[in-house]
Amino acid sequence: MSYNITNSNQYQYFAAVWAEPTPMLNQCVSALSQSYQTQAGRDTVRQQFANLLSTIVAPNQRFPDTGFRVYVNSAVIKPLYEALMKSFDTRNRIIETEEESRPSASEVANATQRVDDATVAIRSQIQLLLNELSNGHGYMNRAEFEAILPWTTAPAT
């Protein structure tokens, strides 16, 4: 018994692009209250989002028979998830000084504004992702999955 792969683009479903719905929603809610003033803080939350993803199906491992999973490669979720992950990476863009050990007042003000802008961007992307998940976008269950990629059983003997 296995999935009947008929198109090369079907291999994407076997990658680590799935998340459990409740932990994903909880992570969004939790992340909205985080402080993003340091790159280490942004990296931590980015890693928490990345850690939610896993593989749940393989060519010979069937989609779970109960519940839904978030498919982050869905047309609605993918651009939001990618934008969120990109918004966390502000390394080397926050403070750019001519002499790193003694930034000028304007460089410090500029860096502060960039941190504030990064925080707004991160929270905005999290809220957009949370809204779409709350509206039921990006979820798949076994029936929906197997409409795309049929499960074949061995012939009866």
From Swiss-Prot:
Gene Ontology MF: a single term: structural molecule activity
InterPro entries to which the protein is assigned, alphabetical: TMV-like_coat, TMV-like_coat_sf
Residues modified as N-acetylserine: 2
Record-annotated membrane-spanning stretches: none
Localization in the cell: Virion
Keywords assigned: Acetylation, Capsid protein, Helical capsid protein, Virion
GO cellular component labels: helical viral capsid
Principal place of residence: virion
Family indicated by similarity: Belongs to the virgaviridae capsid protein family.
Function description: Capsid protein self-assembles to form rod-shaped virions about 18 nm in diameter with a central canal enclosing the viral genomic RNA.
Protein name: Capsid protein
Origin species: Ribgrass mosaic virus (strain Hr) (RMV)
